[in-house]
Swiss-Prot record:
One of its GO terms (cellular component) is host cell nucleus. It holds the Pfam family Herpes_TAF50. GO terms for molecular function: DNA binding. Keywords: Activator, DNA-binding, Early protein, Host nucleus, Transcription, Transcription regulation. InterPro entries: Herpes_TAF50. The keyword tRNA processing does not apply. One of its GO terms (biological process) is regulation of DNA-templated transcription. It is found in: Host nucleus. Its main location: host cell. It comes from the Viruses. This is Putative transcription activator BRLF1 homolog. Transcription activation. Belongs to the herpesviridae TAF50 family. The gene is IE2.
Length: 552
């Protein structure tokens, strides 16, 4: 075994609070990875060690990373996203340090891992630089009180990652022990301060928003493609930039140290493309943090359990038999109807964790705005602006082609049908499964006719609370009670909803039916989320000037 460097147990087993089972599994994968790189005998094209199929090896590594995400969420809660990034970066640093390019052609087990290890480490390092930088800028602008000891540890992590970004990429494998020590110090400091009550709920909610969980599909998709011979043109990157670029010599930064200056990493100057990171809507997040308990109960489509569900459905058959039976919890099981039905689900939402209780609800009324309490003129005005139909259109009749309205099923009447599934080609969505204390449903038309002109969402301008009776299209007066209540109580959640990042873990239980779409004969992959026509009604929501325009 001349020339082969095998990992040492003491160094390869060092991570930030991983369970013994996960550490043992990682060490066995690393040994298999290095063993597959042994030289072939002279004059022979056969490999010394039998190889594991490359795809199965990558799937097993991804399975371990999913287990890490689940452990970090269970142990550290809001801080789990940052600790998970550190641990996954440590794993790929080992793959990068133990690879041998001139021997990889003799191996099928870890060839694609060796090719992409450098890119993955760079991606995770830049991700930590971006998130830690946003942490300090947004906390100061949002009125978040961060304990000094916790801020010092996060600043040290940011400094280590910045130094890696400014140096040559061939040095990305350095500093693993330093990152481990800082990760342990981060967890110990956070737990100690939390036990003393020094970290309030607002700070925890802010940490959760700033350090989201990594989307493992972003990292492993190009690795899977490389294992099948489909190399992607561009490596894994966190921002839009040149594919190949010469790294400046470190000497150009030497004079900055004496002047107490520093160079900004390139990641802070480019446009971020990584999924899940909080969009840069400005540094002031005080509105979002007005109800921190609500944010702490929110989950993302990138939550560990949601990612684990999709992973097991897609790659479960590639796992060894002793891993297929491992279940994280009862909530990690996919719904039974997942194989044949795809729920009409917004573009940025996660798949449900259980069967019918968390499925999106199709409301039986276009106006859950307490319509029975509104004047008749207001009901007619809202109906016409929302559906694009005159108030007196008989049930079942459709207006001329091209208007793309929502079908009128007599929903404004007391005898409105309770089941809307399968009626027409127009999908109805509700905001009750998205917003707490919601007072209104969303009904946005979806244009399914290929011959019709582009579908435009029709919106109403919200009334001015200070206006006098008769000043606006709402009929008999100023803003109704429901719109005033919405503006006072739910403004803090609007930005989250518009960005499409979060939804309630336990949506309100309504008595309406569930709208599902049979895709058993469809060519769409049920794991890829809703089709383009279904998701089109939620596009461009981030560009809405007034958030209230989304609900009309």
């Amino acid at each position: 075994m001349k020339g082969i460097i095998y990992p040492r147990k003491s160094s390869a087993d060092a991570y930030v609070y991983l369970s013994p089972g996960v550490r043992e599994h990682l060490f066995s994968l690393l040994v298999k990875y290095t063993s597959s790189q042994r030289d072939s005998p002279a004059g022979s094209s056969t490999k010394v060690a039998p190889d594991t199929p490359q795809t199965n090896f990558i799937v097993e590594i991804q399975w371990v990373c999913h287990k890490i995400l689940l452990e970090m969420e269970e142990q550290f809660g809001s801080l789990g996203g940052l600790v998970a990034d550190i641990n996954i970066c440590l794993i790929w640093t080992l793959f990068r340090n133990y690879k041998h390019k001139h021997r990889m052609n003799n191996s099928d087990t870890g060839k694609s891992c060796a090719e992409y290890a450098q890119s993955v480490v760079k991606h995770l390092t830049e991700r930590m630089v971006y998130c830690t930088d946003k942490f300090f800028i947004n906390s100061a602008c949002s009125g978040v009180t961060v304990p000094q000891n916790l801020a010092l540890v996060i600043a040290s992590i940011s400094q280590v990652c910045r130094n890696k970004c400014q140096g040559a990429w061939r040095r990305m494998g350095n500093g693993r022990r330093t990152l481990i020590d800082l990760g342990l110090q981060l967890v110990n400091t956070y737990n100690l301060l939390n036990a003393c009550g020094a970290i309030d709920d607002k700070c925890k909610a802010f940490i959760k928003l700033t350090f989201p969980y990594l989307n493992l599909e972003t990292v492993y998709s190009p690795v899977h493609a490389a294992s099948t011979g489909l190399h992607q043109k561009m490596a894994i990157s966190l921002y839009k930039g040149q594919e190949k670029r010469k790294v400046p010599n470190a000497t150009i930064y030497s004079n900055l140290v004496t002047q107490e200056k520093f160079a900004l990493p390139e990641i802070l100057l480019g446009e971020i493309t990584d999924e899940g990171l909080l969009a840069n809507k400005g540094p002031d997040l005080e509105k979002l943090l007005s109800e921190p308990q609500t944010i702490l109960k929110l989950v993302t489509k990138l939550s560990p359990v949601s990612q684990f569900q999709v992973f097991m459905a897609r790659w479960g058959d590639k796992l060894p038999s002793h891993l297929k039976d491992v279940c994280v919890s009862d909530s990690s099981q996919l719904p039974q109807q997942y194989e044949n039905f795809k729920v009409v689900w917004p573009q940025h939402q996660t798949w449900p964790n259980d069967e019918t209780s968390a499925l999106p609800i199709a409301s039986a009324s276009l106006l859950s705005l307490q319509a029975e309490n509104l004047p008749t003129s207001v009901q007619n005005s809202v109906a016409q602006e929302t559906t694009g139909l005159p108030p007196q259109v008989p049930a079942g009749e459709m207006p001329p082609r091209g208007n793309c309205p929502v079908e009128d099923h007599g929903l404004l009447n007391s005898d409105a049908p309770d089941d809307l599934s399968g009626k027409g080609d127009y999908d109805l969505f509700t905001s009750d499964d998205l917003l707490p204390m919601s007072s209104g449903n969303v009904a946005i038309p979806v244009c399914e006719d290929p011959l019709a002109p582009p579908c435009k969402k029709q919106r109403m301008e919200p009334p001015d609370p200070l206006s006098t009776p008769g000043d606006n299209q709402w009929g008999d007066g100023a803003a109704s009670a429901w719109i005033q209540s919405y503006m006072e109580n739910e403004d803090a959640y609007l930005e989250l909803i518009l960005q499409g990042l979060y939804h309630l873990d336990e949506p309100p239980k309504l008595e309406d039916s569930i709208q599902v779409q049979d895709v058993s004969n469809s060519t769409n992959d049920p794991l890829e989320g809703p089709s383009r026509s279904q998701a089109s009604c939620f596009e461009d929501t981030e560009n809405i000037a007034n958030p209230l325009d989304l609900f009309v």
